[in-house]
Design a protein with these regions (language model features):
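Conserved HGGG/HGGXW glycine-rich cap/lid loop of the alpha/beta-hydrolase fold
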Residues: 33-82
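Conserved alpha/beta-hydrolase catalytic His-Asp/Glu region
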Residues: 166-219
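Active-site loop/oxyanion-hole signature of alpha/beta-hydrolase fold enzymes
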Residues: 20, 25-26, 33-34, 72-117, ...
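Acidic catalytic loop of the alpha/beta-hydrolase fold
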Residues: 228-232, 258
Length: 278
């Protein structure tokens, strides 16, 4: 693993000249702010959602700047981090690969109290990290997190079934040389259509279900969802809170998948601040 030391202290590390670390063959760009990293200084790791980058959490991290050292990732494939390489078997990265890379990096750092804050995809990776590397962090805040398969109505399940059947038909037509790219774009989700070179990762990640795995998690966990979130419905949070012993759940009225980070920012910051208390 390679660690590129950038400036420390209370100045945000600009990603115009990104500070990076390399783990599991992937380069991770990141920004840092707050107190210098040291064994007696808490460390908050902010993990953004799919299609976002470190800026998603920058305002929240700044609000807690004096309380801890803060690292804000650009996960491989987002922001200024290049896409992760294919694995040796030719398959795409999944959440386990992202979690393993982060764990490798954390193992190289001074060991203070660590808190993982993950939104959406960042929550998926956090759950995987908590299961595969339970000693890597001490507590988590999950915000609008994915990780469990959402429960859908009969109508929604029928629509998904028809969409899957259409994709299978399109793949068959591709084998005969038919250009079906426009049709694929039509039937894919917005994230699927915009995924580009990250599409294999996206397809793998959204197919994962961590329901059985998360039962093994034993750490303080605060779970926050927006009541109007239609991308990571609060039902996921309700199930997570039942599966993870000792976790707490807050569902914020009137907020969706993204406003839970802005209008709901004070609640998220409060949850992190409570976990930072000695």
């Amino acid at each position: 693993m390679v660690w590129d030391h950038g400036p420390t202290g209370r100045t945000v590390l600009t990603l115009s000249t990104p500070t990076t670390f390399a783990a599991k063959g992937a380069v991770h760009a990141f920004a840092a702010l707050g107190r210098p990293l040291a064994p007696d200084v808490p460390h908050v790791i902010w993990a953004h959602g799919w299609g976002q980058d470190h800026h998603a959490f920058l305002a929240l991290a700044r609000s807690l700047e004096r309380a801890a050292h803060h690292t804000l990732f650009d996960f491989p494939g987002f922001g200024q981090s290049p896409a992760p390489p294919q694995k040796a078997d030719g398959s795409a990265w999944g959440t386990a690969d992202y979690a393993d890379a982060v764990a490798d990096w954390l193992a190289s750092l001074p060991r203070g109290r660590r808190i993982w804050v993950g939104h959406s995809f960042g929550g998926r990776v956090g759950l995987r990290l908590a299961v595969r590397h339970p000693a890597a962090v001490d507590a988590m805040v999950l915000v609008g997190s994915h990780g469990l398969r959402p429960r859908r109505s009969l109508v929604a399940r029928a629509r998904i079934f028809l969409r899957v059947r259409m994709f299978k038909t399109l793949r068959l037509l591709e084998k005969f040389g038919v250009d079906v790219s426009a049709r694929k774009a039509k039937y894919g989700s917005a994230d699927y259509r915009s995924a580009g070179s990250m599409r294999p990762v996206f397809v793998k990640v959204v197919s994962e279900d961590q329901t059985e795995d998360v039962k093994a998690i034993r750490m303080p966990m605060v779970i926050i969802y927006g009541a109007l979130d239609d991308q990571a419905p609060p039902d996921i949070g309700e199930r997570l809170s039942k599966l993870i012993p000792g976790s707490s759940l807050s569902i914020l009225p009137g907020l969706d998948h993204y406003t839970v980070l802005t209008d709901g920012g004070p609640q998220v910051a409060h949850a992190v601040a409570k976990l930072l208390e000695p």
